[in-house]
Amino acid sequence: MIVAIGTLVALVALGCTGAASPSPSPPPEPVALKVGLGFIPSVQFAQFYLADQAGYYRDAGLDVELINRIDPELVTLVGQGAVDIALADGTSVVPAVSQGIPIRYGATIYADFPNVVYAPADSGIATIADLEARKIGTPGRYGSSWIMLQALLGSAELTPEDVELVLFPDFSHAACVDRGECDAATGFANNEPVVLGLAGPAPVVFTVDDIVPLVGNGLIVGEATLEAKGDALRALVAATLRATEEIIADPEKGLEAAIAQVPDLAADRETQLAVLEATIEMWQDDVTAADGLGALDRPGWQAMVDFMSGLPDSPVAAPVTVDQLLTDELLAR
């Protein structure tokens, strides 16, 4: 009997040892993602800064590196897989895909097209038709501003030959308006006109949205990268849109995130907040109101493709369809 009890105790002890909890597995390594933003770090990228600083990317299992490049360079790098995901507008995506660069646009960030033509309040320019024979500063006959300018002029039955273009390849064209050397200039609705309006009378601003629905900046991915890192990319988009919603509700939160990322912005909080508030307006439209932030406007894409394909010296090298340009795989609805 004593032997039996001893055996039972030994078995119980063995059973307890066998039921011990295994040591926890180490957490998975975060997925490294290189995210391309516009050329100059600014308050306009506040949602990316907030998502990074608040830990939304980290909590989603991501190790995010934010880099700044010009739009055409980002398109190429994303197509090559050197950058995982980046901001680019539709007028860059269409020519790239038509030339065989394997990218897709998967989430809208700017629901409105940001490129505009603006003129000082005292310029005597009140309508697009008033631009005839006027000096307009712009970087060159290429890119999103050039396509936008052709759409605006065409709406008043004007062509680029009906105005005097003053080209600034170094992107200093805003200064020509400040110096009175140009009557108007191309720019961004959430930048130069905002700054001018803070310093004096609000400028005249011509937008293209009611003329041709050119597609604003959104997130593009390479096809191979999407296949290899789809889950991580979806997590990044979800975290970014979460931060976007928070900034819409509380712009000061976005401003603080931008200043933490770019301390020089603190030198003029009033201007930076005004720029951010103008930017927030451009993140939203009827499509995002109906379908949520990031939603893709397929009819708008088709209208843009049709317009760009019909331009003189069209940048569209070969016919493309909307399905070749877009992916629904980045938006986890």
Name what the model sees in each region.
Residues 91-92, 172-267:
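Pocket-lining segment of extracytoplasmic ligand-binding domains
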Residues 16-26:
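Bacterial lipoprotein signal-peptidase II cleavage site
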Residues 301-333:
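Conserved C-terminal helix/tail region of periplasmic/extracytoplasmic solute-binding proteins
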Residues 24-169, 174-179, 183-190, 205-207, ...:
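Short, glycine-/small- and polar/acidic-enriched structural segments
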Residues 42, 69, 87, 143-144, ...:
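Soluble non-cytosolic domains of exported or imported proteins
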Residues 1-9:
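Sec-dependent N-terminal signal peptides
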Residues 229-311:
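Secondary-structure end/capping motifs
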